[in-house]
């Protein structure tokens, strides 16, 4: 039976991880993914370099071993030649020594040739491993480039998504006519203006229907009548300024006092 504390711990860790992923910045997550891909490529490149280095080292050992084999072959031939010359000269002791030297060189030659065969096998395996490592690095480099290109695309899409979210929020706010915070909405401002306008109209109607309103109307009517009378007087005086038909200038007459006490203007010549 599983430990309940372990299960609870795993559940909390999974929940915590999901919450982090849910609230994490996508831009940061994209950068983390690219950095992880770069670290993987770097590690793969180092491993491939070690494999290729091992193949190069085996190649150098093989070349040295082949050079040693060539030298041993030359030594064996030289020892056999000297042994033949000593035998021809009748020097059996020298011939024996040269033959023994030739046998020793031949034994070394056999050992070197066996070592070369082993090195060739290892070298072939190293060549195959190096080729595979190179291909793996090339493939991973292509994958890394694709991820970098994908990062650029995702960042562009992320910026577009942010702008679209802002536009959508603005449109939603305008459609609901709900201004954020303490700023009044358009409906509230419209209601306030209409309420003030209606109150002003109501006050004007009350003023017109009151006694003071009637008195004000009488005063306004008197002012208008006086203004009309004054206008007619000015017109009459302007008509009197014109010359008579005989060409003589009319003698002006003093203004006479009207019944109301005001002095009325008299046109010239009347």
UniProtKB/Swiss-Prot annotation:
Induction: Expression is regulated by ClgR. Induced by carbonyl cyanide m-chlorophenyl hydrazone (CCCP). Induced by the cell envelope stressor SDS. Levels are regulated by proteolytic cleavage by PepD to help maintain cell envelope homeostasis. Disruption phenotype: Loss of the gene does not alter resistance to cell envelope stressors. Residues 240-258 have a biased composition (Low complexity). The keyword 4Fe-4S does not apply. Keywords: Cytoplasm, Stress response, Virulence. Pfam families: PspA_IM30. Coiled coil: none annotated. GO terms for cellular component: cytoplasm; peptidoglycan-based cell wall; plasma membrane. Residues 238-270 are annotated as: Disordered. It is found in: Cytoplasm. InterPro entries: PspA_VIPP1. It comes from the Bacteria. Overexpression of PspA results in altered lipid droplet morphology. Self-associates and forms homooligomeric complexes of high molecular weight in vitro. Datta et al. show that PspA interacts with ClgR and Rv2743c, but Armstrong et al. fail to observe interaction with either ClgR or Rv2743c in E.coli in vivo when assayed using a bacterial adenylate two-hybrid assay. Also interacts with the serine protease PepD. Belongs to the PspA/Vipp/IM30 family. Involved in resistance to stress. Facilitates intracellular growth of M.tuberculosis. Associates with and regulates lipid droplets (LDs) homeostasis under conditions of stress and may regulate non-replicating persistence (NRP). Could be involved in preservation of envelope integrity and tolerance to surface stress. Has an inhibitory effect on ClgR activity. May block ClgR activity after stress and then, form a multiprotein complex with Rv2743c-Rv2742c, leading to the release of ClgR. This is PspA protein. The lineage of its organism: Bacteria, Bacillati, Actinomycetota, Actinomycetes, Mycobacteriales.
């Amino acid at each position: 039976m599983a430990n309940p504390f372990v299960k609870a711990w795993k559940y909390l860790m999974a929940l915590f991880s999901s919450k982090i992923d849910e609230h994490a910045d996508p831009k940061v997550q994209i950068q983390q993914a690219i950095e992880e891909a770069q670290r993987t490529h770097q590690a793969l490149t180092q491993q491939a370099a070690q494999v290729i280095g091992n193949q190069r080292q085996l190649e150098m050992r093989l070349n040295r071993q082949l050079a040693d084999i060539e030298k041993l072959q030359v030594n064996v031939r030289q020892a056999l030649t000297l042994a033949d010359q000593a035998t021809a000269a009748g020097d059996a002791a020298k011939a024996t020594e040269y033959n023994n030297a030739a046998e020793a060189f031949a034994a070394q030659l056999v050992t070197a040739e066996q070592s070369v065969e082993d090195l060739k096998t290892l070298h072939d395996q190293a060549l195959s491993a190096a080729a595979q490592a190179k291909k793996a690095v090339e493939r991973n480099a292509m994958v890394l480039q694709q991820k970098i290109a994908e990062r650029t695309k995702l960042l562009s899409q992320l910026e577009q998504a942010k702008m679209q979210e802002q536009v959508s929020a603005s449109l939603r706010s305008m459609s609901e006519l709900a201004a954020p915070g303490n700023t009044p909405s358009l409906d509230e401002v419209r209601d306030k203006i209409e309420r003030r306008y209606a109150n002003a109209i109501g006050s004007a109607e009350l003023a017109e229907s009151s006694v003071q309103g009637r008195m004000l109307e009488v005063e306004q009517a008197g002012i208008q009548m006086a203004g009309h009378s004054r206008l007619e007087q000015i017109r009459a005086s302007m008509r009197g300024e014109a010359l008579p038909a005989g060409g003589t200038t009319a003698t002006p007459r003093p203004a006479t006092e009207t019944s109301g006490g005001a002095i009325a203007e008299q046109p010239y010549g009347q």
